[in-house]
């Protein structure tokens, strides 16, 4: 830095000396020119005097004019040079002042930097001293802590690590629980969406199958011919078909009563043919019953084939198709089993499509899930066991066999399709109008449901809705708070499970409402 200041000072001195020397040189040149001009003028004058005395005055004037011009020009040039030199001197002075100020600033900065460096050095020494003191104190504290706790440093580290691991394990468990709960919630939501979509897309009938059939007669005189002499005709018909004929005051009608729909259909077909033919006697009755039995067997096969065609299911064994057709004449709680099986197959296929599963396999499993009901009155065992035996005998797919075995929860479901079939079975059976119960039983169940709910303290009103599948309980807010509302719901649910028989599930909803009313006057 000192070298730069010295160099700038020398440069300024050299510039000033050069300016002065230039000025002196220019002044000497100007004076030389003036002297030369004067000498030339004198020479001219002398020459003029010698050459022409006549024009002496004019020559003298001309010379004087020339001398005056030369002098004027020389003086002007001198003034310009002098002004220029003065300007250069002024600029040099300004630059010198600027350099002086910069030099002072640099000196001040250098002095400030020196002070700061000295201060930083001092602080660094202080920090180093403090670090050494802190390290000494920490070492003493560590020794004291080890003495008090009875743990060495490594042992304490292991204890802390174990505590941290335990805490992290707890937090991880909570996180996993939260994620699992969220996953279940999302799965339930998705399941509800799939079930809702399947139900909306499924158009099913409201069935009401009965255990009696009615045969219309052309007139009441036909009743006597059906009974026959000493009742031989009616006895023959009842013996051959196993169906009771009820002939009462109902005009122009005979009622066929029996719990086997196939036998009832055979009796109905045979009786209609006898009435149409008009020849009614035991031999003719036996002939018509045999013919009706063959026709019903053929109709059963056609029902099975038509069902598989409508559902788009191929490759079923012919015997299995015939057994499937028998479901047309079977009912469960008033619901036609074949229609129920078709409905289950359709629902299972819709839900399988939503989940990306095999739709045809799901429909096949749904259609055959109740196949055992076709012959459960002829073979020992539950319809589930019989269905599994039939499916195994006719070499059905393992998924179909598992769906039949698990649709009532008797066996664990090993595939998604089995779970879908069970869900579709519950949907088909639980939908409004699918199955029938007596009005008296239904009303008694609803009354019992409301009675159980109203037996608890704090209950204000109780409403059984959705055909007894939900009960809504209004409680008194000044007696039952939010915490007791949850407990009340659990207690009512437990009592319903203990005292009431019901199909499916019953939803218990406890509603606590607080109203604040004021009047503006």
From Swiss-Prot:
The keyword Oxidoreductase does not apply. It is found in: Cell membrane. Residues 211-274 form the KH domain. Residues 105-124 are annotated as: Disordered. It is a single-pass membrane protein. Pfam families: HD, KH_1, RNase_Y_N. The chain crosses the membrane at residues 5-25. PROSITE patterns: HD, KH_TYPE_1. InterPro entries: HD/PDEase_dom, HD_domain, HDIG_dom, KH_dom, KH_dom_type_1, KH_dom_type_1_sf, Ribonuclease_Y, RNase_Y_N. One of its GO terms (biological process) is mRNA catabolic process. It comes from the Bacteria. GO terms for molecular function: RNA binding; RNA endonuclease activity. Residues 337-430 form the HD domain. Keywords: Cell membrane, Endonuclease, Hydrolase, Membrane, Nuclease, RNA-binding, Transmembrane, Transmembrane helix. Its EC number is 3.1.-.-. GO terms for cellular component: plasma membrane. Endoribonuclease that initiates mRNA decay. Belongs to the RNase Y family. This is Ribonuclease Y. It comes from Halalkalibacterium halodurans (strain ATCC BAA-125 / DSM 18197 / FERM 7344 / JCM 9153 / C-125).
């Amino acid at each position: 830095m000192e070298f730069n200041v010295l160099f700038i000072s020398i440069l300024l001195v050299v510039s000033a000396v050069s300016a002065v020397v230039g000025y002196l040189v220019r002044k000497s040149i100007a004076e030389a020119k003036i002297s030369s001009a004067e000498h030339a003028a004198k020479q001219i004058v002398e020459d003029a005097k010698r050459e022409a005395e006549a024009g002496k005055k004019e020559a003298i004037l001309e010379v004087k004019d020339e001398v005056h011009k030369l002098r004027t020009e020389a003086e002007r040039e001198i003034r310009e040079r002098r002004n220029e030199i003065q300007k250069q001197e002024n600029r040099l002075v300004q630059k010198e002042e600027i350099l002086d100020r910069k030099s002072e600033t640099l000196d001040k900065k250098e002095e400030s930097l020196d002070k700061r460096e000295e201060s930083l050095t001092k602080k660094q020494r202080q920090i180093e001293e403090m670090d050494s003191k802190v390290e000494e104190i920490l070492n003493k504290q560590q020794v004291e802590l080890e003495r008090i706790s009875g743990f060495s440093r490594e042992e304490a580290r292991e204890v802390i690590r174990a505590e941290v691991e335990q805490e992290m394990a707890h937090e991880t468990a909570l996180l996993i629980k939260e994620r699992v709960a969220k996953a279940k919630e999302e799965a339930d939501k998705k399941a509800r969406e799939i079930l809702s979509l399947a139900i909306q897309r499924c158009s099913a009938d409201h069935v009401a199958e009965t255990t009696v059939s009615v045969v219309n007669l052309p007139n009441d005189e036909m009743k006597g011919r059906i009974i026959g002499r000493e009742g031989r005709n009616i006895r023959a018909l009842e013996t051959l078909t196993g169906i009771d004929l009820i002939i009462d005051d109902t005009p122009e009608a005979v009622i066929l009563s029996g719990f086997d729909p196939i036998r009832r259909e055979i009796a109905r077909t045979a009786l209609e043919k006898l009435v149409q033919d008009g020849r009614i006697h035991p031999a003719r009755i036996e002939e018509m019953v045999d013919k009706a039995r063959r026709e019903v067997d053929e109709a059963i096969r056609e029902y099975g084939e038509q069902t598989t065609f409508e559902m788009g299911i191929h490759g079923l064994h012919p015997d299995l198709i015939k057994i499937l057709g028998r479901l047309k004449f079977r009912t469960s709680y008033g619901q036609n089993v074949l229609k129920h099986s078709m409905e289950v197959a359709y629902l299972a296929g819709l839900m399988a499509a939503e989940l990306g599963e095999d739709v045809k396999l799901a429909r096949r499993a749904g259609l055959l899930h109740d196949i055992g009901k076709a012959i459960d009155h002829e073979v020992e065992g539950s319809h589930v066991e019989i269905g599994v035996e039939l499916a195994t005998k006719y070499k059905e797919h393992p998924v179909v066999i598992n769906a039949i075995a698990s649709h009532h929860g008797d066996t664990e479901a090993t595939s998604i399709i089995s779970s879908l079939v069970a869900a579709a079975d519950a949907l088909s059976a639980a939908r409004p109008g699918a199955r029938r119960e007596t009005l008296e039983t239904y009303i008694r169940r609803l009354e019992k449901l409301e009675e159980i709910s109203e037996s608890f303290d704090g209950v204000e009103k109780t409403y059984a809705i959705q055909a007894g599948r939900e009960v809504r309980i209004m409680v008194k807010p000044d007696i039952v708070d939010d915490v007791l509302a949850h407990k009340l719901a659990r207690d009512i649910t437990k009592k319903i499970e203990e005292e009431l028989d019901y199909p499916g599930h019953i939803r218990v909803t406890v509603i606590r409402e607080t109203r604040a009313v004021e009047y503006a006057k």
